[in-house]
């Protein structure tokens, strides 16, 4: 059962690709390179955060219909893809759509899907398992902005160094989480053994 926590925790970790702290790293370099106002860039996070409120019921429906594994896999796939495509954006509308996708995934399907599958697998140790999910998120919240800034600084002489940083984020999301979700996660513990973990 703890391997399920590892898979779920990986999604909680990588969802920080679309965290507010992560986009904050990009505000200055993107505004300087693209000529956009900082308010415009930050606004993408705020707008998507509002939209995610209405997406949550849909996320719950998808998880109930298709299971947490499929929902989490495609959420991580989209999160990585949207990050990669942001690296190629020159248009505010395109940026809003792409970052909005990532932000909605951050706020809704990953959080709900990870909590749902852990609840199915654990009874007595559910609190500990859920706590590990929270820890995974907290670690990602600290590391993603740090790594994003490091990549920008490594190519600091280039005005569009932020683009390479988004590529790094997208690839990192895929490499860390997709294999774990695909190969280790099982929605129903009864598919493997008759009793859930304690």
Regions found by a protein language model. Name each.
Residues 77-90:
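C-terminal ends and interior cores of transmembrane alpha-helices
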Residues 1-22:
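Pair of pore-lining "gating" transmembrane helices in MFS-fold secondary transporters
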Residues 49-57, 141-142:
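Residue-level signature of mid-helix packing/kink "hotspots" within the transmembrane helices
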Residues 55-67:
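Helix-to-loop junctions at the C-terminal end of transmembrane segments
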Residues 164-183:
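Symmetry-related core transmembrane helices of the 12-TM Major Facilitator Superfamily/SLC fold
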């Amino acid at each position: 059962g703890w391997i399920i926590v590892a898979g779920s925790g990986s999604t909680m970790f990588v969802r920080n690709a679309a965290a507010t702290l992560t986009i904050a790293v990009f505000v200055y370099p993107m505004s300087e390179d693209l000529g956009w106002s900082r308010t415009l860039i930050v606004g993408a996070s705020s707008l998507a955060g509002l939209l995610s409120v209405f997406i949550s019921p849909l996320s719950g429906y998808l998880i109930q219909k298709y299971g947490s594994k499929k929902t989490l896999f495609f959420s991580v796939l989209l999160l990585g893809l949207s990050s990669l495509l942001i690296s190629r954006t020159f248009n505010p509308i395109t940026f809003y759509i792409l970052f909005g996708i990532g932000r909605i995934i951050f706020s809704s399907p990953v959080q709900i899907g990870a909590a749902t599958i852990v609840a199915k697998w654990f009874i007595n140790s559910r609190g500990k398992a859920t706590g590990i999910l929270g820890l995974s998120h907290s670690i990602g919240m600290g590391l993603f902005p740090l790594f994003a800034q490091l990549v920008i600084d490594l190519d600091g002489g280039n005005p569009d160094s932020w683009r390479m940083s988004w590529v790094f984020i997208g690839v990192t999301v895929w490499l860390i989480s997709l294999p774990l979700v695909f190969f280790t996660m099982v929605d129903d513990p009864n598919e493997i053994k008759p009793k859930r973990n304690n």
